[in-house]
């Protein structure tokens, strides 16, 4: 059994190890560590298979931006509790987004067959959800959960017609994504009228 002096010698090293582990955990868990694209950054172009009301088409960011701003939201997986809540919230708000000229698109790593069902039952056929099975869109937008999993982080972007990121919000709680993106979009629309 070690004596008290050798125990004291072990504690400082153990303390530094513990502090380092806590710092790493806090950094990885921080919402700020999840999304790197910031306001003013150019939004990466993408096209992907998407489902709206169970009907598959190709969603093109460039084509959507020709019509107005885009609210792009990433979510971890269809039919999970938080993602279902978020889909319902976006579906309830989609008419307000459309009144501001905006298109809403959700993106996850789910396959298109799953999204066909999700787009009808949870998105209520109000907006499209795109399949990013190869995770290229998530990577381009730095929206991978913890950067190592196959799931998207819960990250929302507002992108203006000039392909610029206007607003970014990352939080695994789905409750504020609609409220915050709507507020950013309304402020942008008000500035456009001046």
Model region roles, listed by residue range:
Residues 2-21:
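Bacterial N-terminal signal peptides that target proteins for export
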Residues 34-36, 41:
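Boundary of Sec targeting at the N-terminus
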Residues 44, 69, 153-155:
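Short loop/turn microsegments at loop-to-beta-strand junctions
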Residues 47-69:
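A short beta-strand-turn-helix
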Residues 84-123, 135-138:
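Structural microenvironment flanking redox-active thiols in thiol-disulfide oxidoreductases
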Residues 152-194:
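Thiol-/selenol-based redox modules, centered on thioredoxin-like
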């Amino acid at each position: 059994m070690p004596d008290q002096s050798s125990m004291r010698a072990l504690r400082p090293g153990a303390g530094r190890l513990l502090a380092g582990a806590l710092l790493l955990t806090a950094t990885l868990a921080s919402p700020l560590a999840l999304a790197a694209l910031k306001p003013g950054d150019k939004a990466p172009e993408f096209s992907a298979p998407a489902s709206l009301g169970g009907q598959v088409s190709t969603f093109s960011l460039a084509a959507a931006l020709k019509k107005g701003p885009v609210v792009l939201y990433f979510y971890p997986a269809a039919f999970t509790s938080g993602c279902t809540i978020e889909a319902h919230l976006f579906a309830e708000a989609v008419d307000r987004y459309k009144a501001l000229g905006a298109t809403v698109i959700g993106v996850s790593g789910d396959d298109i067959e799953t999204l066909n069902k999700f787009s009808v039952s949870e998105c209520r056929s109000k907006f499209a959800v795109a399949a990013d099975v190869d995770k290229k869109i998530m990577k381009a937008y730095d929206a991978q959960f913890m950067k190592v999993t196959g799931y998207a982080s819960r990250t929302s972007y507002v992108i203006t017609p000039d392909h610029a990121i206007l607003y970014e919000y990352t939080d695994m709680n789905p409750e504020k994504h609609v409220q915050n993106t709507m507020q950013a979009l309304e402020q942008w629309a008000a500035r456009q009228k001046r």
